[in-house]
């Protein structure tokens, strides 16, 4: 910063005093009601070659809006000026404060005073380019001194409100098309309604004469900017003091070559089809962005005039208008004089390409989102520690047939060998062939589950649910449904150990191998699965039970219709458990018939 900007009397002690922002401008994406907040941060830099006595070191950010217009003078009265200025935003930072009527000495050296603030997305955007009407933000850094003039440095801040990548203006084409009877069929369109400031507007024309001998004359395309200024925008419409004005931003005149431009359009008629490009100014003093804030409303539209030279000699004129929206792109930097920094056509084309390839939302623009590297992964990664009891680990759920037990030592890191596991499983199957008393069965069940690490509390296995029927390895692929109906109320995972038990997972995942399956008898293809009545009819010596049979209980418990509706499941279970000891052998025979019927399918 040049020293001429400082006051005298000790200002020469300052080698450097400036406001440095992390970002040159603040960008809001979307309207005032939808845009997210943005963070403004930077540093106040101070370099002293000698000690300096100061009262305070402060930084202020001020937002000011001003609306002003001049009415033209007449012969009777002179010109009249209407204006209003208001401060709508203020933020202050105090870095040094010696107190009232006191000073402190800043030693020679370099100083950095960081600052930051969150700017709401509803804040007005910067509007600059008009002589007496604007919305601006300015920083003011001040070093207060007691017996000398304060040292002050200023810096402007630009807030840009651009369109969100999902805005309809970026995807909707604008067109006007109609038929002038016995004159011309026309279509005038633009690819998008939104246009980046400093680029160009493409206009597509399609003109088809309907009158023989009709010729197209001069075609005029204009970009019109309208200003709607209001001194008191917060008041009702009836009492607002407003002023409206328009100006022409771009004027393009074009004449067709009657011979060269004539072509066949849509394989139906002869006409003219061409495009015109309207280059926008590179400075805000000649063209503003569309806005509506703080009593300043700027809008743009395209106006077209097409001369039609009739065969009888008179001239007709076709007129049409199209609305367009001009917005400032963050990819095209604007300097303090409101001019584009890079005004080359290549820069404008890059901005258009970046907008077309933009994938919403831009990752770099979300400054307040927590980065993935800063997120605690606990609770997000799966499977969690609690999912192990009910989930096979790795390859342990595959190829665990009786013939493949020898290879399990290579798949697990447990201390249980394959032979030991095979022996335990054999003992477990052998114990199921025996017919212990109910008390013995209960004790055996508790011991087995304690050995396997399974709790026998109210959520664990009960004595009534442990089936005493034989279970063969060959039929272990189809899970048996008998004897487990009384656990339908237990949630999944409540009866399994919390910590992973690899040996239990292996035993539960044990399935017959392919060679075992092919040795099984195959029933005829046209045979159907026997129903419940067909299987029960084969048992002529079946004793009468005090309650429905176990298979019937399971069907009712699972919601399968059996012809007995409205039965209380709880009472059915109690009746079955009371008669379980007396009908045990008959139940085994009945299950065997069920298994044989399934094998024939």
Curated annotation (Swiss-Prot):
Stretches for region Disordered: 374-397, 454-496
| InterPro entries hit by this protein | Arrestin-like_C, Arrestin-like_N, Arrestin_C-like, Arrestin_domain-protein, Ig_E-set
Instruction: Provide ranges: composition bias, Low complexity.
Output: 455-473
Q: Which cysteines are joined by disulfide bonds?
A: none
Where is composition skewed (Basic and acidic residues) in this entry? 475-489
Q: Which GO terms describe its cellular component?
A: cytoplasm; cytosol; plasma membrane
Gene3D superfamilies for this protein:
2.60.40.640
Q: Which GO terms describe its molecular function?
A: protein-macromolecule adaptor activity; ubiquitin protein ligase binding
Mind listing the GO biological process terms from this record? regulation of protein ubiquitination; ubiquitin-dependent endocytosis
The record ties this protein, via Pfam families, to: Arrestin_C, Arrestin_N
UniProt keywords, alphabetically: Ubl conjugation pathway
Provide the function of this protein. Component of the regulatory network controlling carbon source utilization through ubiquitination and deubiquitination involving creA, creB, creC, creD and acrB. May be involved in signaling by recognizing appropriately phosphorylated substrates via its arrestin domains and then recruit a HECT-type ubiquitin ligase such as hulA, leading to ubiquitination of the substrate, providing a link between ubiquitination and phosphorylation in protein regulation and stability.
Q: Which family does it belong to?
A: Belongs to the arrestin family.
Q: How does it assemble?
A: Interacts with hulA.
| Protein name (record) | Probable HECT-type ubiquitin ligase-interacting protein creD
Q: Which organism is it from?
A: Aspergillus fumigatus (strain ATCC MYA-4609 / CBS 101355 / FGSC A1100 / Af293)
> Upper taxonomic classification of the species?
Eukaryota, Fungi, Dikarya, Ascomycota, Pezizomycotina
């Amino acid at each position: 910063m040049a020293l001429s900007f400082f006051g005298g009397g000790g200002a020469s002690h300052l080698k450097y005093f400036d406001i440095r922002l992390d970002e040159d401008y603040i960008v809001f994406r979307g309207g005032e009601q939808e845009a997210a907040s943005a963070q403004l941060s930077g540093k106040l830099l101070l370099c002293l070659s000698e000690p300096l006595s100061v009262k305070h070191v402060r930084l202020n950010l001020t937002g000011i809006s001003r609306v002003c217009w001049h009415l033209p003078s007449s012969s009777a009265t002179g010109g009249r000026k209407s204006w209003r200025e208001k401060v709508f935003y203020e933020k202050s930072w105090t870095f040094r404060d010696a107190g009232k009527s006191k000073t402190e000495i800043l030693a020679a050296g370099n100083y950095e005073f960081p600052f930051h603030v969150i700017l709401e997305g509803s804040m007005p955007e910067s509007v600059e380019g008009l002589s007496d009407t604007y919305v601006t933000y300015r920083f003011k850094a001040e070093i207060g001194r007691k017996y000398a003039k304060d040292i002050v440095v200023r810096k402007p801040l630009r807030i840009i409100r651009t369109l969100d990548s999902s805005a309809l203006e970026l995807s909707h084409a604008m067109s006007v098309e109609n038929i002038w009877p016995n004159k011309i069929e026309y279509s005038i369109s633009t690819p998008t309604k939104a246009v980046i400031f400093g680029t160009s507007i493409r206009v597509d024309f399609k003109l088809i004469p309907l009158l023989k001998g009709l010729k197209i004359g001069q075609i005029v395309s204009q970009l019109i900017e309208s200003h709607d200024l209001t001194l008191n925008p917060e008041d009702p419409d009836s009492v607002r003091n407003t002023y409206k004005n328009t100006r022409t931003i771009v004027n393009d005149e074009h004449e067709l070559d009657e011979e060269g431009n004539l072509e066949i359009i849509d394989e139906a008629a002869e006409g003219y089809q061409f495009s015109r490009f309207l280059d926008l100014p590179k400075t805000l003093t000649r063209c503003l962005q569309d806005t509506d804030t703080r009593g300043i409303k700027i809008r743009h539209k395209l106006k077209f005039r097409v001369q039609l030279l009739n065969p009888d000699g008179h001239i007709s004129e076709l007129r049409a208008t199209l609305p367009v929206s001009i917005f400032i792109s963050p990819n095209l930097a604007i300097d303090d004089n409101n001019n584009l920094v890079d005004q080359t056509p290549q820069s404008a084309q890059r901005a258009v390409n970046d907008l077309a390839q933009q994938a919403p939302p831009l990752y770099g623009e979300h400054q307040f989102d927590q980065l993935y590297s800063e997120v605690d992964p606990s609770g997000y990664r799966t499977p969690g520690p609690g999912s192990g009891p009910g989930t096979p680990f790795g390859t342990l759920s595959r190829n665990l047939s009786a013939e493949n037990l020898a290879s399990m030592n290579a798949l697990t890191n447990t201390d249980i060998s394959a032979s030991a596991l095979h022996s335990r499983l054999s003992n477990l199957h052998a114990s199921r062939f025996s017919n212990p008393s109910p008390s013995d069965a209960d004790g055996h069940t508790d011991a087995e589950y304690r050995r396997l690490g399974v709790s026998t509390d109210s959520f664990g296995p009960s004595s009534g649910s442990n089936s005493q029927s034989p279970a063969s390895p060959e039929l272990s692929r189809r899970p048996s449904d008998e004897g487990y109906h009384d656990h339908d109320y237990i949630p999944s995972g409540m009866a399994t150990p919390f910590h992973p038990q690899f040996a239990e997972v292996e035993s539960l995942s044990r399935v017959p191998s392919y060679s075992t399956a092919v040795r099984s008898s195959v029933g005829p293809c046209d045979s159907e699965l026997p129903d419940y009545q067909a299987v029960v009819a084969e048992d002529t010596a079946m004793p009468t039970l005090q309650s429905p049979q176990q298979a019937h209980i399971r069907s009712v418990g699972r919601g399968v219709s059996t012809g007995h509706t409205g039965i209380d499941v709880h009472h059915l279970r109690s009746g079955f458990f009371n008669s379980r000891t007396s009908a045990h052998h008959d139940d085994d025979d009945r299950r065997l018939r069920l298994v044989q019927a399934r094998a024939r399918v």
